[in-house]
Swiss-Prot record:
This is DNA replication helicase. The gene is HELI. It comes from the Viruses. GO terms for molecular function: ATP binding; helicase activity; hydrolase activity. Belongs to the herpesviridae helicase family.
Length: 881
């Protein structure tokens, strides 16, 4: 990539210094003036990585310019014919051109950083294979610049909720030759994924919505006499609902190793179909989609599930993932010229210990395991009973191979906390509900020919399918109790779920939250104000709401400075000085508070005449009926400096204009920073570590329940699966944005009425910055697909929380964990699962496991490892250290 891509102004600098230039050149600063400590280490790390990433960016950009002739462009008519076919086996094979660039590497090697660079240097659609992967990428991108939310690849190509239960592989197509040509492989994948693809295709072409946005832009160009394509970008400014695939031909998929091999063709198919249907400029130019697959083929498995209705069993099997398919399939490998379109990232930057990093490379690339490696892993082994005892390793994350083991540990942990007398970690239970429609259930029994099927049995078999996340099986849940409401046509199944107060949790899906306060220390709140992190993360819809909210917290929280001065043991002289300085600061920022400053300078120490504050000018006497004697005694008894005149002289209103909103925030922020500086000067570290709590209204606690006077003044936001939260309790306080959101959902009439009457509590969480929020309930609808019939069966309502105290190894993929204790199974031990589990830790000092997997009998995928080792020796493959 040219230097101008990284340093846009460099070329202009060279021009100004060329021979004959009249411009005076400022001499550079002497070398001795340069201080390398002025820059953080991250700056140097980014520059050392740039050399390796530049060729990756340049090659992907080169692939994105590739075009095919008009004869090679898939015609729109071919896509329109597909829904009319009786069977997908009748599909006429057609070559759908595409390019692939593969980015692989071991855990923590910088693959996500490469995605960040691609996002900043070119127009591309960034996606994740799963919701967790998508949100991990979003977290990475938003840490540097404001970015739109990242969708999964399924959301981008048109996958919908009713496709979850689709029966994949219902039709099978066998290629007629070996090795098969690319169009034969593509037909095989389309036939395999037919139930989903035909529904997406039919839905697109049967839609009455206009798809002439690009035609309108081209007509406008002709009308204005502009060059073709000069106004194309306006289409995305005026039509926000345009598919992202019509904007660019570069599609990036993070954690692509979790996808089955057929998804490569599915993405290519949908890209061509959407661009053909919308007649996009890149379709007219014959541009070819570039699928950038990011991940590790040795870390992950692609899993497919199939539910057998007759026996009520869910069968899960592993299938060839898309990365392995690209690397090992001869036809695909040669078609995409893999050697010149592959970058391998090496070195684990998550855990930077040399010996441990070498061990990770051995597991990643299938290198020979030596006795030295085994002895290193021996140092991490402790008895399994030690890991499974909740009294040991408090605060560590347990990793298990199955949901059943996670649930068993959570039940053991809760039982331990109930008898331990622990005050910080208190156990409490809340109900979760599943609403089953009786008419749909009766129809299901009829279609599946199971007239005697009981609802209890069906619920037990479908517990993991009814909810919208697999971690629901990790919970410590009680026995399900069913209640029939005949008038509503609904059966309500209630299950009590146990939670731990003050434990670390994460949300299980992207959920709505309502931020209403802050709970932390003076130091952490000061850091939030200086960093503007809240504005960047919470002000996604309108920054004014975020500033209004912070102004509310600042105004409510100022009293904390005065509360600190009432602590016993403080030096009285410094306390008086703090009162005096705060009074002067308040008088400076709020002119009406100047009376306080003069009172604080009164050497006599006489009480301030509060009655005089309300007397008109020139008033010398009169009746005292305007003042209640009790109030007079209260005010007169206070030392004149102990009253925060901010609350006496400043009327807190909610401004409307942007200028007024920011002016109010700036004044209150200046006052907070000024007071913070005064207290740091007088009290130092004792002050900055003191608690600072502020909310939009008064709150109180009763056990694990939190009572809030009003939520007015809070701000609505989004909770992501990648965020870490502390569970602070629950509340039944009404949150009107949640009520409005529920009203907009098209729920079954009986379910909506029953759920509305339950007044289901909502969880209160504190994020890593200290902000307190109410989390909306997690409501998911379950649609069953049986023999081409879709049945709207049930609606599940729970709290959408997953504990970070224990999880499955598969769930931990992509996470960085501080302290990890792993329980590996003694049978069916796979090295790729071992690698995923061990590579989660940021330091091997905080890693424990129940056995040494290298000394146990295990399975190892040597085929893919051999291909990766061959690639490392291939000079055409880009290696990034």
């Amino acid at each position: 990539m040219e230097s101008a891509d990284i340093l846009p102004g460099s070329r202009g600098t060279v021009d100004r210094r060329c021979e004959g230039s009249e411009e005076k050149i400022t001499p550079p600063r002497p070398v001795e003036d340069f201080n390398p400590q002025l820059f953080p280490n991250e700056v140097y790390l980014n520059f050392t990585s740039m050399h390796g990433i530049q060729p990756v960016v340049a090659r992907i950009r080169e692939l994105s310019r590739k075009t095919v002739s008009a004869a090679m462009v898939p015609p729109l008519e071919w896509f329109e014919r597909l829904p009319r076919l009786e069977t997908p086996l009748d599909i006429e094979p057609l070559h759908l051109p595409f390019s692939v660039y593969l980015i692989s590497g071991n855990a923590g090697s910088g693959k996500s950083t490469c995605i960040q660079t691609l996002n900043e240097t070119m127009d591309c659609v960034i996606t994740g294979a799963t919701r967790v992967a998508a949100q991990n990428v979003y977290t990475k991108l938003s840490s540097a610049f404001a970015t739109r939310h990242i969708n999964t690849i399924f959301q981008e190509f048109g996958f919908r909720g009713n496709h979850v239960q689709a029966q994949l592989g219902k039709y099978q197509y066998s290629c007629s030759s070996s090795p098969p040509p690319i169009e034969e492989l593509q037909k095989r994948d389309i036939v395999y994924y037919w139930e989903v693809l035909v529904d997406i295709t039919r839905r697109l072409f049967e839609s009455t919505a206009s798809r002439g946005e690009f035609e309108n832009i081209r007509a406008l160009e002709r009308l204005l006499g502009r060059a073709p394509g000069s106004l194309t970008r306006l289409a995305f400014c005026t039509n926000g609902s345009l598919p992202a695939f019509t904007r660019t031909n570069i599609v990036i998929i993070d954690e692509a190793g979790l996808l089955g091999r057929h998804l490569l063709t599915v993405v290519v198919y949908c890209w061509w179909m959407l661009n053909a249907a919308y007649k996009s400029p890149q379709y007219a130019e014959g541009k070819v989609p570039v699928i950038v697959c990011v991940g590790s083929p040795t870390q992950t498995d692609s899993l497919e599930s199939r539910f057998e209705h007759k026996n009520l069993k869910c069968h899960v099997r592993s299938s060839e993932n898309v990365l392995t398919h690209i690397i090992t399939n001869r036809t695909i490998r040669e078609y995409v010229s893999l050697s010149t379109n592959w970058a391998i990232f090496i070195n684990n930057k998550r855990c930077q210990e040399y010996e441990f990093g070498e061990l990770m490379k051995v597991l990643e690339y299938g290198l020979p395991i030596t006795e030295e490696h085994m002895r290193l892993v021996d140092t991490f082994v402790v008895p399994e009973a030690y890991i499974n005892n909740p009294a040991n390793l408090p605060g560590w994350t347990r990793l298990y191979s199955s949901h059943k083991e996670v649930s068993a540990y959570m039940a053991k942990l809760h039982a331990h906390l109930k008898v331990s007398g622990e005050r910080q970690f208190v156990v409490f239970t809340l109900p979760a509900y599943t609403f089953v429609k009786t008419a749909a259930f009766d129809e299901y029994k009829k279609i599946t020919q199971q007239p005697s099927l009981s609802l209890d049995k069906w619920l037990a078999a479908n517990a993991s399918r009814v909810s919208n996340y697999s971690q629901s099986r990790d919970q410590d849940a009680g026995k399900t109790q069913c209640e029939y409401y005949s008038e509503h046509g609904v059966v309500v199944a209630r299950t009590d779920v146990t939670y731990v107060l003050n434990s670390q949790v994460s949300v299980t899906t992207r959920m709505r939250k309502f931020v209403f306060g802050f709970s932390g220390t003076f130091e952490t709140f000061d850091a939030v104000l200086k960093d503007d992190a809240f504005i960047k993360t919470q002000g996604e819809t309108s920054v004014e709401y975020a500033y209004r909210f912070l102004s509310t917290l600042l105004f409510s929280g100022m009293i904390n400075f005065y509360n600190f001065l009432k602590r016993p043991g403080l030096d009285e002289g410094r306390v008086r000085e703090a009162y005096r300085r705060m009074a002067a600061l308040t008088a400076k920022l709020i002119p009406g508070a100047s009376v306080l400053e003069s009172a604080c300078d009164n050497p006599s120490g006489a009480p301030l005449n509060f009655r005089g504050l309300t007397d008109p000018p020139g008033f010398t006497g009169g009746t005292t009926n305007d003042w209640d004697d009790d109030n007079d005694v209260v005010f007169a008894a206070l030392n004149e400096g102990a009253i925060d005149m901010l609350y006496c002289n400043y009327e807190f209103v909610r401004p409307e204009t942007t200028q007024e909103v920011y002016s109010q925030f700036l004044m209150l922020k200046t006052m907070f920073v000024g007071r913070y500086s005064i207290f740091m000067d007088l009290f130092g570290g004792d002050f900055e570590s003191s608690p600072f709590d502020t909310f939009v209204d008064n709150i109180s606690y009763k056990g694990c329940e939190i009572f809030v006077g009003s939520m007015r003044g809070g701000v609505s936001s989004i909770a992501l699966q990648t965020d870490s939260y502390t569970l602070m309790g629950y509340t039944s306080a009404p949150v009107y944005p949640f009520v409005e959101e529920l009203a907009r959902r098209k729920l079954h009439e009986g379910i909506a009425e029953l759920f509305g009457a339950m007044n289901m509590p909502r969880m209160v969480l504190r994020d890593q910055h200290g902000f307190m929020s109410v989390l909306n309930v997690n409501l998911s609808e379950f649609v069953e697909s049986v023999d081409d019939v879709e049945l709207d069966m049930a609606t599940a309502v729970d709290y959408g929380l997953s504990s970070r105290l224990a999880m499955t190894i598969a769930r931990s993929q992509g996470l960085s964990l501080d302290k990890v204790a792993i329980c590996f199974p003694r049978n069916n031990l796979r090295i790729n699962s071992v690698y995923v589990a061990m590579s989660r830790t940021v330091s091997s000092r905080f890693l424990r496991m129940n056995l040494n997997p290298l000394r146990e009998r295990h399975e190892r995928d040597t085929v893919i490892s051999e291909h990766i080792l061959a690639a490392l020796r291939d000079r055409d493959v880009q290696i990034v250290y």
